[in-house]
Amino acid sequence: MKTNSTAISALVALALTGCNLDSRTKVIRPADRPVAEVSAIAAMKGEQLTEKCSFEKDGYTLLYRRHSPKCEPGVKYPLVLFLHGAGERGNDNTATLVHGVVPICRYAMRHGDAFVVAPQCPSGKKWVDQDWSTQSMRRPETPSAEMAAVMALMRELVATLPVDPTRVYVTGISMGGFGTWDITSRMPGFFAAAMPICGGVDETTAELYRRLPLRFFHGSVDGAVPVGYSRRMDKALADAGIEHGYTEYPNVNHDCWTRTYANDDVLAWLFAQIRGR
């Protein structure tokens, strides 16, 4: 098992240098930044915000992008896992930056910073072995090879980086929404909160999410992933008395992630969650 990294900007290089200084525990809280600094962050592109990395486990190589904070001694940082949709699959380790990653990184940098990790699923593969066009699903007994690699990566990062283990989050869109539901069901107690967007889930597994702070989103006229997935899970969670938040955007098709990640209140909720509280 090994992780390889290639810095692509001076900013990232500086961040990486600082992130191995100390592993003592201290939680960094959201902090306001000067206006000029906020403006500079807003202008940054995905290639400036992240580095290319790879992770090897049992002969499987997983490509991923990683944003790293400029770590301070004695500080541990949140970690956000972002799972992309089907359109970003491949082996370029760049397409993952198209949706989601940039607004999450920018928000984190304005509020104390965090590690943000975005693995890339190979072409023709899926985070979850499921036909997306069907109206319902049953959770596979075992994770896909791609999901198993992501799970191993997350354990490795929490063990080797200055990550606050009580502030590990996951969010994803479309295929990555399926993946968000899936990984949280397979790693109970690992994530502090989850935010699947226009994904699908087996509603009979609702009980698996009882102790997980959860918000999920879907467009009411989604033509790619039927909104019925989220509606049924919303009902199943409610019937079981499991606290959660569900937002359905009226007359919105598949892309409901743009408005979701552009909403600072939504991201503030995610980063405010602390496992065990």
Where are these regions (language model features)?
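Alpha-helical scaffolding within the catalytic cores
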Residues: V98-R106, C198-A206, G228
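A domain-start/cap signature at the N-terminus of enzymes
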Residues: C19-L79, A114, E146, T171, ...
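Primarily recognizes the serine-hydrolase "nucleophile elbow" in alpha/beta-hydrolase
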Residues: V158-T160, T166-L208
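The conserved beta1-alpha1 loop
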Residues: L83-H84, H218
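Gly/Ser-rich "nucleophile elbow"/oxyanion-hole loop immediately N-terminal to the catalytic nucleophile
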Residues: C71, V75, Q130-I173
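C-terminal catalytic histidine-bearing segment of alpha/beta-hydrolase fold enzymes
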Residues: P213-F217, G223-R277
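Active-site machinery of serine-nucleophile hydrolases
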Residues: E88-M147
